[in-house]
């Protein structure tokens, strides 16, 4: 009897073990970390050098180094800061790719475009979009492919991220009642103007460009991804069923739906997960993801973009004192952050310093803490505000990402079984640990939620 009982127990244990072995394993969620090298040349607390970047790599599966660009006339892929990137200067390209020796599981990609390839010449605004001009030129596409391949191979990158600078949607106000009638993506029109009269041609040409890059990369097993920049209409420029064949993954810029630059008179949630009432139904993470899924992009290739910063507006005496968005009668004149040094954007440590803490609890006026408003439903995100005083001064309203809301988006990625999260940008996370003495808190929160 004892032997028989032991045999039964053994069979049960074997059956349990077999069921574990045969159980389907969910694919690993990826974390793509962007590093804008422009932060390397900043002065002050916003300067992120490689030694301070390195601790982040234990949490990243991919590091995307930004940004390269293209020459207008030659269509060559080039460094946007040769003194910083190339061997003749500080040699940051090689410094970054050599990090693979210490972190062999991290793949390091070079990104092209990213809304950072800005021509400063006073006549540049009158010139055509050089990214569209390149697409229209077969010779230009070939030259780009050859030169970008050379950059990637010469400096030891594992692949390329194509953050193509397509024309952006024009800001469009959606008034009460209109939001429910506004269906799908606009195929040609955005707002009251045509974004690109030749969008169908450019869509085909962009597909051809990605195909050619992938063909050049394939013998070396180099990676190829694309970043859909914020407020670029995917239906205009991405032939999704075609391009996914050439891409290892897609990073969606699912943030900056509202910014002070685009919406100087109305403050609202910059990156909600789900649709809000009486808003444009496409201005949220879920709508962007669903569009790519509906067009046959594998869920495993989609990475949801999460920002590490906030978008601030200045409140006026006409903005009211409730802070409830959308907030009208605002201005795009919030004070510039001392760390970021960029109008209309606050890094997470800059936002954190504005929230109630022991250093500002009793301060008044321009130094008084903001009132933080969280979203218990975890659908839209957090905001904070300080109403303007009787003189119309010191008012501010910020929509921002923090460790909690970033983790909520990682949770959304897990629920929808997507590929992972793309973090924009390491330089705006609290890489110095100024807020809570923990470095990279947003990055850590995302990684924890993706893996637990």
From Swiss-Prot:
Q: Where are the transmembrane segments?
A: none
Q: Which UniProt keywords apply?
A: Chitin-binding, Developmental protein, Disulfide bond, Glycoprotein, Secreted, Signal
SMART domains per the UniProt record, alphabetical: Glyco_18
Q: Does the keyword Glycoprotein apply?
A: yes
Q: Which InterPro entries match?
A: Chitinase_II/V-like_cat, Chitinase_insertion_sf, Glyco_hydro18_cat, Glycoside_hydrolase_SF, Glycosyl_Hydrlase_18, IDGF
- Might you report a single GO cellular component term? extracellular space
Q: How is it modified after translation?
A: Glycosylated.
Protein function = Probably required to stimulate the proliferation, polarization and motility of imaginal disk cells. May act by stabilizing the binding of insulin-like peptides to its receptor through a simultaneous interaction with both molecules to form a multiprotein signaling complex.
- Full protein name: Imaginal disk growth factor 6
Q: Per UniProt, what is the name of the gene that codes for the protein in this document?
A: Idgf6
């Amino acid at each position: 009897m004892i032997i028989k009982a032991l045999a039964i127990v053994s069979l049960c244990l074997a059956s349990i073990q077999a069921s574990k072995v045969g159980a389907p394993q969910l694919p690993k969620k990826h974390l793509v970390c962007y590093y804008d090298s422009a932060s390397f040349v900043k002065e002050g607390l916003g300067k992120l050098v490689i030694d301070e970047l390195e601790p982040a790599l234990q949490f990243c599966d991919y590091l995307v180094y930004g940004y390269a660009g293209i020459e207008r006339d030659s269509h060559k892929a080039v460094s946007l800061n040769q003194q910083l990137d190339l061997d003749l200067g500080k040699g940051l390209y090689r410094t970054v790719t050599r990090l693979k020796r210490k972190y062999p599981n991290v793949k390091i990609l070079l990104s092209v475009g990213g809304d950072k390839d800005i021509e400063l010449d006073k006549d540049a605004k009158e010139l055509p979009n050089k990214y569209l001009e390149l697409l229209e030129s077969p010779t230009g596409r070939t030259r780009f492919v050859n030169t970008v391949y050379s950059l990637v191979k010469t400096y030891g990158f594992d692949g390329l991220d194509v953050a193509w600078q397509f024309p952006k949607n024009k800001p469009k106000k959606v008034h009460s009642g209109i939001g429910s009638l506004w269906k799908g993506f606009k195929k040609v029109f955005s707002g009251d103007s045509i974004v690109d009269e030749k969008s169908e041609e450019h869509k085909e040409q962009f597909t051809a460009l990605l195909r050619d890059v992938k063909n050049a990369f394939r013998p070396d097993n180099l990676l190829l991804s694309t970043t859909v920049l914020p407020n670029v209409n995917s239906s205009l420029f991405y032939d999704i069923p075609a391009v996914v064949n050439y891409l290892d993954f897609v990073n969606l810029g699912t943030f900056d739906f509202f910014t002070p630059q685009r919406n100087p008179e109305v403050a609202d949630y910059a990156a909600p997960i789900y649709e809000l009432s009486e808003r444009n139904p496409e201005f949220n993470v879920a709508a962007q993801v669903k569009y790519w899924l509906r067009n046959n992009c594998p869920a495993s290739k989609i990475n949801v973009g999460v920002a590490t910063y906030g978008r601030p507006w200045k409140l006026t005496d006409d903005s009211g004192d409730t802070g409830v968005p959308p907030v009208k009668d605002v201005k795009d004149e919030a004070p510039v952050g001392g760390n970021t040094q960029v109008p209309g954007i606050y890094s997470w440590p800059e936002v954190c310093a504005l929230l109630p803490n022991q250093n500002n609890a009793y301060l008044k006026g321009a130094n008084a803490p903001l009132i933080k408003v969280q979203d218990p439903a975890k659908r839209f995100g957090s905001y904070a505000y300080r109403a303007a005083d009787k003189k119309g001064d010191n008012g501010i309203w910020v929509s921002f990402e923090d460790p909690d809301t970033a983790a909520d988006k990682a949770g959304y990625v897990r629920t929808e079984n997507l590929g992972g999260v793309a973090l924009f940008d390491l330089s705006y996370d609290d890489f110095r640990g100024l807020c809570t003495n923990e470095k990279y808190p947003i990055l850590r929160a995302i990684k924890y939620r993706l893996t637990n």
